[in-house]
Amino acid sequence: MAWYYHVIEQDDHRWLCRHGRRVFDRHLVLADAIAHITDLAAANEPAEVFVHRLDDGVECLHAQP
């Protein structure tokens, strides 16, 4: 079973780091949010990291079998 971690763009263009209902924090810069959530996911593998943009785009960044 994989764990799912999310970086979600907010209306104010900040980036929210989340796992399930748990919000970890918010970042001003996408790269900072990705670095943070990737570290969390790496500690809880198997895990997948998704980036959700305001334009409804979703990208999978980190997947484990």
Residue ranges and their predicted role:
Residues 25-26, 60:
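A sequence-level detector of short linear motifs
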Residues 1-23:
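Short aromatic-glycine-(Arg/Gly/Cys) micro-motifs in beta-strand/loop hairpins
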Residues 20, 29, 63:
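Surface loops and adjacent helix of pleckstrin homology
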Residues 28-45:
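A short, charged, amphipathic alpha-helix used as a generic interaction element across diverse proteins
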Residues 43-65:
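Short, mixed-charge low-complexity intrinsically disordered segments
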